[in-house]
């Protein structure tokens, strides 16, 4: 199962009595703040949850899987999520659904 932004908003409505537009705006604003920080080149640290970090990837040779032709892959910046210790511990305790 995947948790969506709509489901996050629904959970806020249920747990905190927000109306639908407030909950949706809160979820959108939360993710927008993370996006803006990352666009500015800042890491995002959410205590008890984890960190979103920016990493620079160097250019490298790649390969077109269809043709086998060698293709250069340009340098780029990527976002990496590193879960915090508390999140890792909680996930490790949870039994996977079959």
From Swiss-Prot:
Keywords: DNA recombination, DNA-binding, Transcription, Transcription regulation, Translation regulation. The keyword Transmembrane does not apply. InterPro entries: Hist_DNA-bd (IPR000119), Histone-like_DNA-bd_CS (IPR020816), IHF-like_DNA-bd_dom_sf (IPR010992), IHF_alpha (IPR005684). GO terms for biological process: DNA recombination; positive regulation of metabolic process; regulation of DNA-templated transcription; regulation of translation. One of its GO terms (cellular component) is cytosol. Signal peptide: none annotated. The keyword Transcription applies. GO terms for molecular function: DNA binding; structural constituent of chromatin. It comes from the Bacteria. Heterodimer of an alpha and a beta chain. This protein is one of the two subunits of integration host factor, a specific DNA-binding protein that functions in genetic recombination as well as in transcriptional and translational control. NCBIfam families: himA (TIGR00987), PRK00285.1 (NF001401). Belongs to the bacterial histone-like protein family. This is Integration host factor subunit alpha. It comes from Mannheimia succiniciproducens (strain KCTC 0769BP / MBEL55E). The gene is ihfA.
């Amino acid at each position: 199962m995947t948790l969506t932004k709509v489901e996050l908003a629904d959970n806020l409505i249920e747990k905190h009595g927000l109306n639908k537009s407030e909950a949706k705006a809160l979820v959108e604003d939360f993710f927008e703040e993370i996006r803006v920080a990352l666009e500015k080149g800042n890491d995002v640290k959410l205590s008890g949850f984890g960190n979103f970090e920016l990493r620079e990837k160097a250019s490298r040779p790649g390969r077109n899987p269809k043709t086998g032709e060698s293709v250069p892959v340009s340098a780029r910046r990527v976002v990496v999520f590193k879960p915090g210790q508390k999140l890792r511990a909680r996930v490790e305790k949870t039994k996977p659904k079959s």
